[in-house]
Amino acid sequence: MEKLMSGGRLIAEALVAHGVDHVFFMDAILRQALVEMEELGVRRILAHSEKGASYMADGYARIARRPAVCMSQSVGAANLAAGLQDAYFGQSPVIALTGRQVAAMQYRNAYQELPHEPLFRSLTKRSSRVELPEQLSMLLRQAFRDATTGQPGPVHLDIAGHTGDVIGSAKFNYGKVDSDNEFSVFPALRSPGHPDLIKKIATLIQAAKRPVVVADLGVTVSNAEAALQAFAERYSIPVVASLDAKSTLVESHPLNAGIVGTYSRDCANQVVTAADLVIFAGSNVSDQVTNNWTLPRDGTQVVQIYCDPAELGRNYQNTVGIPGDVRLILEQLTVALEPISRAQWLAQVAQYVSDWKKSVEPLRSSAEMPIRPERLCKELSECLPADAIVVSDTGYSSQWSGTLLFLEHEAQRYYRAAGSLGWGFPASLGAKCARPDLPVVCFTGDGGFMYHMLELETALRWKINTI
């Protein structure tokens, strides 16, 4: 007799085969799969809310650099979907699994029955329905492909059964579970830039007198910090960064010209205003990184490096766009020319940076009580371990920490909410699950913390030692 396994076992083995070692969920969902996951060594983190679970998965994915999984039953799907907004904006490969009543129960006023596709469509790269057992293996595999390729992002699978139990309890032939190891990390299947475009951009770099690199989220997603530093140093190009790429260069690096855009340092915006060539690296050129599209000046030559060709030149017509992986393209550009010196331009940039630091130092050293946020950021800068991960909420938390927290060690990393207040604390728990060996610090305020304060119990129960 042929050996059979449940759909729950297939789901558990498929997740493990793709490198998943944590799931974040709200009960009740895929209970058979959860039992099988325990046997396979997967930590099952039961949260206090669906949004908390999705934020934990998001934080985990960003730090672990591989897909993460969150789950909820049918009635919790709307809350889970709301929590994917930050993963979508942050290009984080979170795979959301929900249950839904079987087809025979739909459109008949069944208990807790609601179409889920409209809830997830605008927040995911793909939302698929697993109606039949035959679809399960293929759609699970496709979910990892969708989440990790191109511009990474969340994916949703709606699994038949109020708690996914119809598929979870179905029987399958026991055998090797389909998986694709290349989709266990992100970004998967990196693409280099076209040689003709590399030559064209190299010509612009050589001709420029005052170039600047604007490092954005794609640099962090692509793990391109080292490649960008080598590129900037070879051609003597200062670097400004969005909050999402704050970790690109250490604070004291002579080419670090600060945080640009709306939540910014004046010096960084001054550099972009003065530049004659602006290279957006890993950027979709959004409002925040351009200070509502007022940076750079009209007519300035723009180069845009981005993984999605549809985004190239969307907001600036004077753009030479190159699609592909930002790390690979920076590596190609770094060997395209001989080293270039720009002493006069770098001296001008250094003066902008020096003037800004002098202007904020009285606040960073203030003895006022209660302590000012600027002083808090200075104290935190000085005591952060060399390998610390800082996870910040949005709003003033990211304005203060993003601009006034100085990261002086290459191993230090900074991640912030893309816009959902309350994301910081659950995301920091997910980050700590991904790297329990590293110190994780959550920078948030009372309002942000109160959104998901109950997850303190989750942290205590699982010994997730986030600060």
Per-range role (PLM):
Residues 9-20, 59-65, 88, 146-151, ...:
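Glycine-rich phosphate/diphosphate-binding loops that line cofactor/substrate pockets in enzymes
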Residues 21-25, 43-45, 63-101, 214-217, ...:
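A short, small-residue-rich loop immediately preceding and capping a beta-strand
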Residues 62, 217-303, 408-438, 452-454:
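Glycine-rich, anion-gripping cofactor-binding loops and their flanking helix/strand elements
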Residues 11-12, 16-19, 24-30, 35-36, ...:
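Active-site diphosphate/adenylate-binding microenvironment
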Residues 1-2, 134, 180-184, 199, ...:
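Phosphate/pyrophosphate-binding active-site segments
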Residues 97-139, 245-348:
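Glycine-rich, acidic loop regions that bind phosphate or pyrophosphate groups
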Residues 97, 106-112, 274, 313-315, ...:
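Thiamine diphosphate
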